[in-house]
Regions:
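Nucleotide and nucleotide-moiety/phosphate-recognizing core
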Residues: 1-67, 77-92, 98-109, 113, ...
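Hydrophobic alpha-helical segments within soluble ligand-binding/sensing domains
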Residues: 72-75
Length: 150
């Protein structure tokens, strides 16, 4: 269902009602989807779990954090700006990074392109692990999930 500039779905994980939100904005405007949904459902930032890609992590690596800066990620920058805080948990999925020598558009092409070969396999596996990490955060808490998945 399209609401808040996002595809939304409500489901239950471990007995907890969960709103899934996939912004339909450009990445650098993700906060325009997250903040209205958070306001509507009266969700404090610490109850918002963001899953995003991260080019600073090797392909397939997960990193869970309970809060932090954007790390240069434009989607996270937008969410931080819209919520007015960095204090929300996130799961970062490593997608690796391109060789940028001589190509100023290499990073843009990398994150907007399609992964192939071993990187694609690693990221596919990481996405399955990220889904398990989401369940772990909801059912067991962030500290336990960080110990399991970091």
């Amino acid at each position: 269902r399209l609401r808040f500039n996002a595809l939304t779905c409500i489901d239950t994980i471990g007995g907890e009602k969960v709103l899934f939100l996939k912004p339909q904005t450009y990445m650098n405007l993700s906060g325009n989807a997250v903040a209205p949904a958070a306001a509507f459902y009266k969700l404090p930032p610490e109850k918002i779990l963001v899953v995003c890609d991260d080019i600073s992590l090797p392909a397939g690596k997960l990193r869970l954090r309970s809060k932090g800066s954007s790390g240069g990620h434009n989607g996270l920058k937008s969410i931080i700006s819209a919520l007015g805080t960095e204090n929300f948990p996130r799961i970062k999925v490593g997608v690796g990074s391109p060789d940028t020598q001589g190509d100023e558009n290499a990073v843009i092409n990398w994150v907007l392109g399609t992964l192939c070969g071993k990187d694609a396999e690693l990221v596919d596996h990481a996405l399955n692990s990220a889904a398990d990490a989401v369940s772990s955060v909801i059912c067991e808490g962030m500290d336990t999930a960080m110990n399991k998945f970091n």
